[in-house]
């Protein structure tokens, strides 16, 4: 994707200004009845991305740990991971690799991902769900085909570049005759170092835009797309964001709040509006995990209790029985498959 070969200066110019924390998004909580969501990215996208990185395993593991990324994704039953954790990983990768290598890696990985993950078969609904978008619009006028993505707020330009590259890979997979973009638009705000940035006169880039977008020379036959993400209960997003960490990290509400970039108060209030709590969502996931490893791995109750963060096996058994009416071993006996 040639337009991104010229953005390394942009990345280098702000290397000293990249914030290590995730912006708190209390501004999303505009009042009663507002639907909240947590940005998620499909695990398969991330797993493929990590598998293609040309990094020494120890270095990659350290970057993942610093970003609070879930580990052992290949054995996790989770479908999604929090996009903010992946966003922090992207920022760490850019600092580790340098701007030029980071950009070229994004391009190469996205190109291979379009084959590995069969982007040519993905529906628009698949795309917005997989990439954590709120909406995707594609329209063609007399001279321009415009691809516009509505995403939740991020404060890292690396995430915007990742989405730009992957959206381009999706469009090229669907329409092989599509030319290179004629312009691209990033929500990243204009800053003093960026106002002096000159990329290419024939492929302009615009910062401080409301939405991320790509524009191409018009191509006949491109279908008009106007799809929005399905609204779901906030508890669903909490469950999906937590799922990859269950049995690996005993996550408190404070840590979870930092992980997703939403204040603890907002998480509590949003769940309370739906008649549930963080503890209830977390316990339900814990018990699902426990049931799975009781059967599939024949794990001991004490080991499960430790993995799930309980003080001891007795505390876990009591919690399990309170929710399920029977003890873990009674449940295992009743659900053990016969040979």
Language model region names:
Residues 61-62, 158, 251, 280:
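Short, solvent-exposed positions on alpha-helices
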Residues 3, 8, 20, 114-205:
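N-terminal regulatory/effector-sensing and dimerization cores
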């Amino acid at each position: 994707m040639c337009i991104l070969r010229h953005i390394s200066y942009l990345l280098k110019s702000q290397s000293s200004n990249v914030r290590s924390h995730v912006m708190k998004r209390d501004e999303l909580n505009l009042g009663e009845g507002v639907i909240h969501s947590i940005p998620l990215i499909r695990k398969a996208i991330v797993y493929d991305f990590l598998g293609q990185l040309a990094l020494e395993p120890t270095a990659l593991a350290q970057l993942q740990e610093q970003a609070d990324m879930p580990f052992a994704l290949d054995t996790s039953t989770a479908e999604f991971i929090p996009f903010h954790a992946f966003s922090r990983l992207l920022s760490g990768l850019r600092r580790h690799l340098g701007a030029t290598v980071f950009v070229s890696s994004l391009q190469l990985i996205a190109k291979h991902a379009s084959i590995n993950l069969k982007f040519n078969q993905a529906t628009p609904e698949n795309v917005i769900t997989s990439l954590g978008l709120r909406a995707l619009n594609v329209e063609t006028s007399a001279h321009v085909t415009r691809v516009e993505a509505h995403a939740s707020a991020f404060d890292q330009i690396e995430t915007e570049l990742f989405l730009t590259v992957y959206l381009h890979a999706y469009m090229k997979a669907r329409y092989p005759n599509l030319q290179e973009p004629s312009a691209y638009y990033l929500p990243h705000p204009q800053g003093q170092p960026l106002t002096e940035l000159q990329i290419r006169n024939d492929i302009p880039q615009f910062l401080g835009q409301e939405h991320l977008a790509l524009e191409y020379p018009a191509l006949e036959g491109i279908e008009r797309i106007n799809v929005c993400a399905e609204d779901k209960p906030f508890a669903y997003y909490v469950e999906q964001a937590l799922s990859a960490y269950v049995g690996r990290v005993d996550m408190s509400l404070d840590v979870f709040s930092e992980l997703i970039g939403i204040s603890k108060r907002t998480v509590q209030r949003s769940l309370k509006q739906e008649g549930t709590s963080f503890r209830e969502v977390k316990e339900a996931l814990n018990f699902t995990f426990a049931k799975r490893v009781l059967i599939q791995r024949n794990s001991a109750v004490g080991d499960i209790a430790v993995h799930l963060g309980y003080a001891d096996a007795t505390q876990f058994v009591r919690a399990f029985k309170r929710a399920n009416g029977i003890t873990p071993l009674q449940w295992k006996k009743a659900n053990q498959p016969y040979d």
